[in-house]
Amino acid sequence: MSKIVKVIGREIIDSRGNPTVEAEVHLEGGFVGMAAAPSGASTGSREALELRDGDKSRFLGKGVTKAVGAVNGPIAQAILGKDAKDQAGIDKIMIDLDGTENKSNFGANAILAVSLANAKAAAAAKGMPLYEHIAELNGTPGKYSMPVPMMNIINGGEHADNNVDIQEFMIQPVGAKTVKEAIRMGSEVFHHLAKVLKGKGMNTAVGDEGGYAPNLGSNAEALAVIAEAVKAAGYELGKNITLAMDCAASEFYKDGKYVLAGEGNKAFTSEEFTHFLEELTKQYPIVSIEDGLDESDWDGFAYQTKVLGDKIQLVGDDLFVTNTKILKEGIEKGIANSILIKFNQIGSLTETLAAIKMAKDAGYTAVISHRSGETEDATIADLAVGTAAGQIKTGSMSRSDRVAKYNQLIRIEEALGEKAPYNGRKEIKGQA
């Protein structure tokens, strides 16, 4: 009953008004799975290729009709009649047929949309929720946890048109007992932050990920206004709520220096920028820093890991791009201690699960993540629970493309109850 009988690809619109690929996989018995590929703004150079048309007369060149054509043509032909429950087999067929290292023939956006739609269709055929099916695919049936959200409440860098260099300033409601309570806490801080910003005459327009995007005097001021909002919401910073940052440092790495344009073009070496971050961790309870240096600055990352790696979580995003080959090298060299998981960086569910497993086996944490260009697709919520990853990044408390994932987590927690504990601070590397 899980034989694939029809595959449909279409061009839909993402949260930035750009096209993306949506796929449907239909099975015998009327079971259907549907999924859409997300899209990043600050991207690692070694990510799998997101195929765009390049036709400037349509969507300013960002159309995805070639990728959609791959779904409706060669991909559909190759997987029709195959068993959707064999996720690894379906993904292998598509990857082998594409025939390139970075999925540039069909596009990672095409392959991923079909991969996720196939998983959803198989879950439907098995009569189970997606998170349960993912746990089975992961070899960990029945093992779940609810992830600690990293809520991006101030957006900077490539995610906003402001003067803040560091891309994401996040809160983690580690003191909550459930994910539903964590979401409530995050919402309360988010609304108090608006009041704090308005009180200072600052803008409360939001960036790509739903966080506020004010102009600030320094990157440290972002932490200061968040600290004010946490206190105003009635929480204790460092106890109920901790802080995290995504520097996305590749975006301000120029000629071997880290240049903070928003702070008068201050330039830092790798070591100096590491100590700049170290000072921030002494002033504020920052427990996680993502991409604290450029993706190619491996010597710098080795130094940063030596300085900060036993104190806080150091997450590799552009650094590792959800790629097991790169992650393996990082583990061997002792680079960072956590990986950000974005399934469109690698382009299939099977490869994503392999990256999560490799990280966990090496004692690294895995943080499941959205992209700045999203849709209403909430698959990452099921992925986080089904792999018991423990942490999730899915933006702030506004924009339906972000909130869709939080709402799905609430539903899943309601269904699983005590089978999916919310472990709070224990999930974060160096904080147990």
Swiss-Prot record:
Binding positions ((2R)-2-phosphoglycerate): Q167, K342, R371, S372, K393
Record's cofactor remark: Binds a second Mg(2+) ion via substrate during catalysis.
Catalysed reaction, written as an equation: (2R)-2-phosphoglycerate = phosphoenolpyruvate + H2O
Record keywords: Cytoplasm, Glycolysis, Lyase, Magnesium, Metal-binding, Secreted
The protein's annotated pathway: Carbohydrate degradation; glycolysis; pyruvate from D-glyceraldehyde 3-phosphate: step 4/5
Keyword Signal: no
GO CC, alphabetical: cell surface; extracellular region; phosphopyruvate hydratase complex
Annotated Mg(2+) binding sites: D246, E290, D317
EC number: 4.2.1.11
Necessary cofactors: Mg(2+)
Keyword flag Nucleotide-binding: no
Alphabetized CDD domains for the sequence: enolase
GO biological process, one term: glycolytic process
Subunit structure: Component of the RNA degradosome, a multiprotein complex involved in RNA processing and mRNA degradation.
Protein name: Enolase
Source organism of the structure: Salmonella dublin (strain CT_02021853)
